[in-house]
Amino acid sequence: ETVDHQLTSSVANLETLASNRRDFMAQYLAAPREAVVKGAEGPVRAWILAPGKQPDRADRLAALLRDEGIEILRAASPVKASGLRDAWTGKTLAMDLPAGSFMVPLDQPAGPLARALLDPHVPMEAGFFKEEREWLERGKGTRIYDTTAWSLPLLYGVDAYWTGTKPAGDWKDERTQEARGSVAAADPVFGYLF
């Protein structure tokens, strides 16, 4: 029965998509362009991930973001930056970012995804909190689940900052390099395939 319902739902979705394909394609093509504009004009223009005391964590977080299609830049040399907002405290700082720091510009097609993964605050409407209180008072339990992992810089323990202006500096594009395999021995007798 469950599979039948899933099939019915999938077919209905495909039929709706097919009959509205022009509108869907227009929205599909417009969304990345709108994300670039919104990222260039919004109050948060970039996220900075500094190596800090545990640079491997910043490296792993940057790799995760790249794997999700988010564009990352890396400082080839130290960068002077001001107007940075600390993700942990919210304080505004000016600092010298060390070489190896990452910048996640938000004027990119994946800007909204970057914000969703990096922002430390998840805004909720006041009406939601009123409904939540009513649910709790009626003994229905909470509808909120753990939000501590919603901000990846906080989850990874990375020194992270957001800024309304992208810091000028020698930033290099950080694209994921595809791993290339090869056989190291000249005349192997046997090998393993994983």
Model-derived features with residue positions:
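Intrinsic-disorder/low-complexity accessory segments
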Residues: 1-194
